[in-house]
Amino acid sequence: MRLACCSLASTIILIYPKHMPTKITREAALRYHEEGRPGKIAIIPTKPYATAYDLSLAYSPGVAEPCLAIAERPADAYRYTSKGNLVGVISNGTAVLGLGNIGAEASKPVMEGKALLFKIYSGIDAFDIEVDATDPEAFISAVKAISPTFGAINLEDIKAPECFEIERRLKAELPIPVMHDDQHGTAIISGAGLVNALELAGKSIGDVRIVISGAGAAAIACARLYCALGAKHEHIVMTDSKGVIRASRTDLNEMKREFATTDEGLTTLQEALVGADVFVGLSKGGMVTGEMVKTMADRPIIFALANPTPEISYEEAKAACPEVLMSTGRTDYPNQINNVLAFPYIFRGALDTHATAINGEMELAATRAIAALAKQPVPDYVCQAYGAKELAFGPEYFIPKPVDHRLIVEVSTAVARAAIESGVARHTITDWEAYAEHLTSLLG
């Protein structure tokens, strides 16, 4: 069963139609975006505007007072404007998932979609900003120039390796959180899945061998987060289109060099998988065969995340090794790794503490909170949304479902606490019970 989400202001309504189409056609997708008011987002006033007095407060002359207050104390922008609940979803359209470099304007539907997800899952308002600049310096300058508008910035669909430098620079030069979700969202969700899959497999993260297929933005971020969780750097082997990333190769950029192996005996993905405990696919479909799975360690963990066709299908992996612990990026198989489990709540916690950054401590807190939620009893409405009688922690359920309303409280709270404890918060939350109630209210 599939579900549709409709948003009325900040209220989420989950609809479970009995006869909802399952195939997404070109005609249906274009009609969805065109019907009624074109696009997927709009701006709604939050203050009264019915009388002349209301309008005089909203604009001239009343608006001068908050302007003067902010000029005197810039932090008051969080008090008198929407900045504290506003994220910029910013892209240049150079690496749009499944579409590639389609350019800034063509990426707008994707960025609007991201803004919609921010709203319905965490109550965050988001503006999509498409920047027509492929040069990193020009892009960085544009984002810095408009940054006072936002409480945080979500970078989206920017190609590697430029995305690394763009994010690094903006993090260093702006006083608000900046996160490239294509990197860190995937890392956080797969990290949560890895923690739980290892527990089910009875293995320690410090002992396992991990093979990552792909060496782009998400792959590098995943490898870094796994190391932060306890994986050993020397136990990670990364591959790209030319095979294993070895230290002797002369065609490696700085990011790939970070995870280059000194084992010169490994040259292919097939060789790397022999005896490996974990495979994380962030490359393209059909890279792994059932025979390759059979050469992996006992109770292997396979995260085949290429979309729409994974590196190996769920059915083929299970046929090769019934005890495999499997995740994909697809909704129609168990343990979907979906960034929507993370980014709405990471930004929620960051905004609510007026954080100056989203740091490693906050990312790890989100990872552990998501992993912990999968071990709790699953509400009936979540089971019903997926046509399941019951969902319980185990091989078929070790990552929470995106429709689980508890995510906003569990993950946002963990991120907010980490922001405060790590020293990047400019606003401290003291009543955590009231904060949890507030978070729940954002979902109606």
Describe every region a protein language model picked out:
Residues L97, I102-S122, L174, H180, ...:
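Glycine-rich phosphate/diphosphate-binding loop of Rossmann-like nucleotide-binding domains
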Residues Y78-K83, K119-I120, A145-S147, K171-A172, ...:
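Solvent-exposed alpha-helices and their adjacent loops that cap or buttress functional pockets
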Residues M20-V178, S412, R417-R426, H438-G444:
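N-terminal ligand-binding/catalytic initiation module
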Residues D181, A201, A304-I429:
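Adenosine-phosphate binding glycine-rich loop
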Residues R257-L325, R330-D332:
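Rossmann-like adenosine-cofactor binding region
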Residues C5-C6:
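Cysteine-centered motifs
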Residues D128, N154-D157, V178-D181, I212, ...:
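General beta-strand structural signal in soluble alpha/beta enzymes
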